[in-house]
Amino acid sequence: MKENLVDSHGRRMKKLRLNLLDACNMRCMYCMPEDQKFNKLSDLLSPDQIKTIVTNLTQFGIEEVRLTGGEPLMHPQFREILTALTKCDLKKLAITTNAILLDKEIDFLIENNVKSLNISFDSLNENSFNFITKTKTFQKVLSSILKANDLGFNIKINAVMMKNINFEEVDQFLEFSSKHNIEVRFLELMKIGQALQYYDRHFVSADQIIEKISNNWDLTKVPMPNDSTSFNYIATNGEMKAKIGFIASESKPFCGGCSRLRLSNKGVLRPCIMINEGPNISETPIEQYSAVLNELINKKPNYRIEETKIKMNEIGG
């Protein structure tokens, strides 16, 4: 019999963010330094360990898994891991990716019916994109986004908005959304790891973005689930119609409705993106899960912890 995980604040844990690895083929300015060193493959959870942990967690109400990184498509055993997870009792299996390797894996994703992608795409300007990511992959990423969209993937673009870098592109992102019928979500820069040094200079709030959008677009609120990380709108401007969302982790934190747990690439289960500790469940027998999980979720805060020094690629966004 399944056991639902409900914490002392009445939040039921339903979603797992699974950080496959900390390695990435970008060096986004808010995520990690350019000289970042990564964990060895031998130190990461094996595909069998991942399948066992996720299978066990489904017995405690976990219904959705999102693969994150680093860049999950870089994992040398990505296909083996994905195949294993498709056999777990999940309502949804999704991926957050930078799309550099998406074209290589797109047929495999289709074969395994994984059609939900959150794609990090911080700028529609190639020079700004290169500056943010420290790569020259703009055209590759853009073409992969459009190809996946044409193939029927459910795509959400994640754009971290930053003053004096990409904030002026807000209208362009809405036009892009309208043209391609792709949801664009504007993310606030978070006080996490590498981004701490940029926060004061580049932070832009969701309200500032909405104010800018409202100069040219009419906004209609879209109802969202209580545990949604974003609040969403349909934006219209003449014949243009854009689907947009806001993840306002700093100015409008959603901790009170959070239903997520986070599993590190080494097997550490964390109750919150801002907490860098938790039990390692890589070898935990199923008989001990109830006690371990219930102790963990009652350490899950219902308020926003101000900041953490752990890097985003080590947590998984």
Residue ranges and their predicted role:
Residues 47-67, 71-187:
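Radical SAM/AdoMet-radical enzyme domain recognition
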Residues 189-191:
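Extracellular/luminal ectodomains of secreted and membrane glycoproteins with large N-terminal domains
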Residues 1-17, 27-29, 59, 230-232, ...:
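N-terminal [4Fe-4S]-dependent radical SAM core
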Residues 36-40, 125-132, 193-197, 280:
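A short acidic, helix-capping loop that chelates divalent metal ions and anchors anionic groups
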Residues 20, 184, 267:
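Residue-level signature of catalytic and energy-coupling elements of molecular machines
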Residues 8-48, 272-273:
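Canonical Radical SAM [4Fe-4S] cluster-binding loop centered on the CxxxCxxC motif
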Residues 193-307:
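Accessory C-terminal segments flanking Radical SAM cores
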